[in-house]
Amino acid sequence: TRILFNGLRALGVETLSPQGRLFVMARREVVLSAGAIHTPQILSLSGVGPAIDLQRLGIGVRVDSPDVGKHLQDHVQLRCVYRAQNVNTLNQLFHSKPEKALAIFRYALNRSGWLAQGALRAVAFADSQESHSRPDLQLFFSPFSTDQLGGPPHKFPGMSISVIPLRPKSRGQLTLSSADIDTPPRIYLPYLENAEDMSLALKGIDLARRIASQSALR
């Protein structure tokens, strides 16, 4: 939940357990590695962050560090969904009870069948500038389609080509919404706000459409 300090020296951490708060002291050093979201959250709750934000929540300022929680970046995934013709996809397997029962049997018997396969059947890296320097786009091919990630597949045969622009330049930020560790922080991620990110995303979608229009996929 927070780092324990003596002055500016980190001594250990405070954690939550079923028995209550637990204090763990370090013998050598404290390494904070809680991911892109929880790392700045824990730092801020420990008093290390933008002073004006910490004071607003009644958190004592140990180090005024304005960049904590700033420069947040993430990859956006854009999906092109297509109806398939004259072929079964995972959409049909998902909605067929006999097919699902057969898939479970095959997997239990010898770890084969579509349950033993990944959701992504092909991955491509592309250079939108054709400069032959390094890729700036990543594409995933999936033999199923959904309205949203995590949702059920469509009832019609479908496939998806996902486009992910690499090395995004759009930047967001994370700020505390409460001094309570159980309260999620405010996360602002302006996907595609940068004009170059938007241009690259459009090039990726155009490439996905050109791939899907090839005769082998019609």
What are these regions (language model features)?
Residues T1-L11, P18:
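A conserved short coil-to-beta-strand element within the FAD-binding core of flavoproteins
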Residues R9, G20-L22, S133, S170, ...:
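Short acidic/polar mixed-charge low-complexity motifs
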Residues Q19-E29, S33-A34:
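Core beta-strand elements of the Rossmann-like FAD/NAD(P) dinucleotide-binding domain
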Residues L32-L57:
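Flavin (primarily FAD) binding-site architecture
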Residues P40-L43, A51, R79, L202-R209:
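Non-transmembrane alpha-helical segments in soluble domains
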Residues P50-K155, R210, S215-L217:
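Mid-to-C-terminal "cap/lid" subdomains and adjacent gly/pro-rich loops that border
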Residues V123-Q129, L137, S142-D147, F156-R218:
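C-terminal segments that line or cap access tunnels to active or ligand-binding sites in enzymes
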